[in-house]
């Protein structure tokens, strides 16, 4: 990534409630700008996503909220590593998997998506790299365990600059709930996107690992839980107040 070199990996913390974490560590301990997003799946359904988190350090991490799940559990994430000239290197971290079933079959590679009556593609967000793009409708488990689909533009719109990422996340922080649909576009529930506020209480296990990596300085590297203010195109007074 430009003049930087990263180790990027995911970890799954499995228990009565499970969570995932995406890590990116600059090998030479050089501080740099990065943006991360982490996903937790149950049986191909997206159940938790940690909203975009940006930071400027040599250790970047982002964990999802805990979720009680079973079956085939997977964690993965997306990253943006920014170069000094403003360009960036993007990609997806390797998937970590755990199955609660001893007889679980290996997941087959998907190379194309089916379409609904409206011509919209649908499937798991896990398959976006093998297919070459994400589906229009992403398989997800919403509130109260309702299974359905969320729209790609609601969960992963095209973003390029750090400012675009920050402003998208600011909108999510202000209004995290999005509709959950059936295949025909009927609203059947809701899905809660990850917010910056979710990071207010650091996970003790992750903080302990970070302390081991940094000699007890985990507080310097934990992601910020301070919500990003939404920018408005309102004029302002001399005191900076919008009107």
Describe the function of each predicted region.
Residues 1-14, 212-227:
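N-terminal prepro-regions of secreted/extracellular proteins
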Residues 93, 101-108, 172-224:
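C-terminal partner/receptor-binding element of secreted or periplasmic proteins
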Residues 117-148:
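Glycine-rich loop/turn
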Residues 158-160:
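Acidic, glycine-rich low-complexity segments with interspersed aromatic residues
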Residues 162-166:
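N-terminal post-signal-peptidase region of extra-cytosolic proteins
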């Amino acid at each position: 990534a430009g003049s930087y070199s990263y180790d990027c990996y995911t970890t799954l913390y499995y228990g009565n409630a499970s969570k995932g974490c995406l890590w990116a560590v600059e090998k030479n301990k050089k501080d740099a700008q990065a943006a991360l997003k982490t996903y937790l799946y149950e049986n191909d359904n997206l159940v938790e996503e940690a909203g975009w988190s940006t930071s400027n350090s040599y250790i970047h991490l982002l964990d999802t909220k805990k979720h009680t799940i079973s079956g085939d559990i997977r964690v993965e994430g997306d990253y943006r590593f920014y170069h000094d000239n403003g360009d960036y290197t993007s990609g997806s971290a390797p998937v970590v998997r755990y199955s609660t079933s001893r007889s679980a079959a290996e997941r087959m590679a998907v190379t194309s998506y089916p379409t609904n009556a409206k011509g919209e593609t649908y499937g798991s967000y896990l398959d976006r790299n093998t297919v070459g793009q994400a589906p229009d409708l992403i398989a997800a488990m919403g509130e109260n365990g309702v299974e359905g689909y969320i729209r790609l533009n609601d969960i992963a719109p095209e973003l390029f600059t750090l400012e675009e990422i920050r402003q998208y996340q600011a909108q999510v922080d202000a209004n995290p709930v999005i509709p959950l649909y059936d295949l025909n576009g009927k609203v059947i529930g809701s899905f809660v996107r990850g917010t910056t506020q979710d990071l207010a209480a650091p996970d003790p296990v992750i903080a302990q690992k970070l302390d081991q990596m940094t000699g007890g300085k985990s507080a310097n590297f934990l992601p910020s839980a301070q919500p990003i203010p939404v920018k408005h195109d309102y004029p302002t007074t001399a005191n900076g107040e919008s009107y």
